[in-house]
Amino acid sequence: MRFTTALAMTATLTMTTVTLGPIQASAHGKPQALTPTATGYGGAVSTVDPTATAVGLDVLRRGGNAVDAAVAAAATLGVTEPFSAGIGGGGFFVYYDAQHKKVHTIDGRESGPATMAEDVFVDPADGQPYDFQEARVSGLSVGTPGTLATWEAAAKKWGTRPLANLLRPAAKVAEDGFPVDATFRQQIADNAAAFGQFDATKELYLPGGAPPAVGTTQRNPDLAATYRRIANRGTDEFYRGEIGADLDPV
């Protein structure tokens, strides 16, 4: 099943020069040769959010490798980009081993129930598929989130830091807050009707009944506590413990 969000990450380990530059297609569909906009050594981190990127860079500066940085940055995106990332969804982790020139991929997409029938998205009343949007946000589309297990597997196999250490920077961002930008505010505005249906999301994303203003500080103390609880007790706390029970009380 493909429920809520998807998160794709790429971790690259290399000892060669890191060169970053835009790639544009020519009229014939081939990339044009452009002058690099940045050149450096030691590593690079790129995400859609400056706070998450800064977390990844800090991990590298402290001696972590690309996998450590990718996991820490991804966990931070769960705070700053909750509409497209986070432990409530799934995704893929792509790792390139430069020494052996081999690509490894962890499939961490969500899994549906083992008893799920093939026609679960067909309305038995008329034999027609349910409306896509209705089916997407209903209980029919719920799957077991794979993101957290993916991070743990990647960290154990290729990283140099335990998952607990890689979750703590994200927990600090969630507790201290991050600046709201125009994109974050617009994403909340686009989902305001849905957020307004629940007290928890209304309080978090609609303070005073409206999306937070650009430039204000957004905090998520509950997510900070969740990350720290998982860091202290392990991922079983999410999948088999109290956090999981809160997610699925049935």
Model regions: which residues?
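Secretory targeting and sorting signals
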Residues: M1-A27, W151
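Noncatalytic scaffold domains of N-terminal-nucleophile
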Residues: H28-A54, A66-R233, F238-R240, A245-V250
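Long, structured ligand/cofactor-binding scaffold of large enzymes
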Residues: D58-L60
